[in-house]
Amino acid sequence: MCLYIRSLCLSAAVVVAGLGPAFGQSEPLVGAAAFGDWRADMPGLSRIIRPDDLPKPGMTPSVANFPHIIGRAPNSMPQAPAGFKVELFANGLSGPRELRVAPNGDIFVAETHAGRVRVLRAVDGSSKPSANRIFASGLNRPFGIAFFPRGNTPQWVYIANTDGVVRFPYAGDLEPSGKPEIIVAELPSGGNHSTRNLVFTPDDKRMLVSIGSRSNDAEGLVRLLGDLQSSWGKYPLGASLGTETDRAAVLAFEPDGNRVGTFATGIRNCVGLAVHPASGDVYCSTNERDGLGDDLVPDYITRVREGAFYGWPWFYIGDNEDPRHAGERGDLKGKITTPDILIQAHSASLGLVFYSGGMFPPEYRGDGFAAQHGSWNRSKRTGYKVIRIRLKDGFPTGEYQDFLIGFVVNDSEVWGRPVGVAVAHDGALLVSEDANGTIWRITH
C-alpha cells in the first residue's frame, strides 16, 4: 500500500502528469502551520514563514534524527506539479552534487567525494546524455563550478575545491584544452562545512566565493572574546575571527585570484550561490544553525548585499539573539540584515538556480529553484525536496512552493537527497541527488 509513501508506486521511469495543486490550496500556509514535516508536502503547496512566527529557543528538544538511506526502488519516482514530466536522466553517478550548464549545453557535475568533475552532453530534448566524460580529477572535494567570461564562448572553467580555486582552459569540449592553473592557493578549510561555491558578478570584475562556518555556532569563539574585543572595528561588520576567520562569509576576488575584500558576513553556510539573470542580484541558499529546537533556526534564501551582516553566530533572523552567545556582541544589534525567504528549519537548503528557460509556463520565468537536502536535527523530518522561490517584479515575496517531492519513503527511510539544480539548454530543470547518485530531468 502506498497511501503515505511519497515515492509513489509507479511502474515506469517517467511521471507524465505530476500531481495536482495541493488539494486546491489558494493561500499559502503561514505561522505554525508552515513549519510542518514531509507528510504535509505536496507539489504546489506554498508556505510563508515570517520572523514573527519563530518560537523561542528550546521550546522543543534538539534531537539527532538522521535518515536511513535505502536504495531507490525501480518504481520510485519524484513528483512535480500537474503538467510537468519527470524522467530519470542519469544514474550510477558517485554522489553528484553541484550542477552547472555550459553555454553550449554541456552539463558539469561535481562528484565531490570522488574528487572529480564530470561532464554530460545531451542534445536538446533528449532524456539521456549521449556522452559522459571525466572533465577533471584529483581535486579536493570540488563543489562550485563557473564559466568565465560570461557569454557564449567562455575561456575558462573555474572549480572551487574545499581549500582553493583552480581553473581549466576551456574551448567547449568534453575535456580541458590545457593544464589547470591555481587561482586561489588557499581558502579556509576544515571543520563542519566543506562546500565552496563561486559565481562571477554580472560585470565579470569579481569572483565571489562562499565559505561555510567551521563549527555549528562558533562554540570556541567565546574563549577568544576578551582578546578580540579591541579588534572588532578593524574588520568587516560582523566578521568572525579566531578559528572562524573568513568563515561564514562570502569573499571577493578578482578573476585572477587577487583578494579584494569580504562581500558579506554572518551567513553560516551559503551552499547555493547564484546571480539573478535579470536583476544581477547575488543570492545565497543557506544552512542555518542547529541545536535550538525543531523550528529554529530557519534556513533561508536571500539577496546578499555587499557589506551586509546576516547574524551568525550572535544573532539570527534579525535581532534574535542566540542564547549561547547572549551579551557577547550587543554592538551588532540593529545592524543585522534579515533574510528574504525563511524555510522550514533544518531543511538543509543547498543548490540554487533562477529559471531563465522558455519551456516552463511564463509565470516561472525569473523564479528560483532550491534543493533541500533534508533534515537530521529535527524530530519530524523535513526537506528532501526541491522548492520554487516566488518573485514578483524581480523581488522575493517570502513565499516558497513545493515543486519536486517523493524522496522520502517513511519517517525513517529516504532514497534521495537533492543537492544541485540547473536549467538545461532546452529549458528543462535538472536536479541531482547524492544518496543514490541520480540526476532527474523535469520538463513541461
Give the ranges of each region predicted by the language model.
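Beta-propeller domains
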Residues: 78, 104-129, 173
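Asp-box/WD-like beta-propeller blade repeats and closely related beta-sheet repeat scaffolds
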Residues: 132, 136, 141-148, 155, ...
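Surface loop/turn motifs at the tips and blade-to-blade linkers of beta-strand repeat domains
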Residues: 88-93, 134-140, 183-190, 262-266, ...
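Beta-propeller domain segments
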Residues: 27-81, 154, 195, 213-261, ...
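Hydrophobic beta-strand segments that make up the repeating blades of beta-propeller
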Residues: 107-109, 155-159, 206-209, 282-284, ...
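Blade-loop segments of beta-propeller domains
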Residues: 92, 96-100, 116-150
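Beta-rich catalytic cores
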Residues: 85, 95, 103, 113, ...
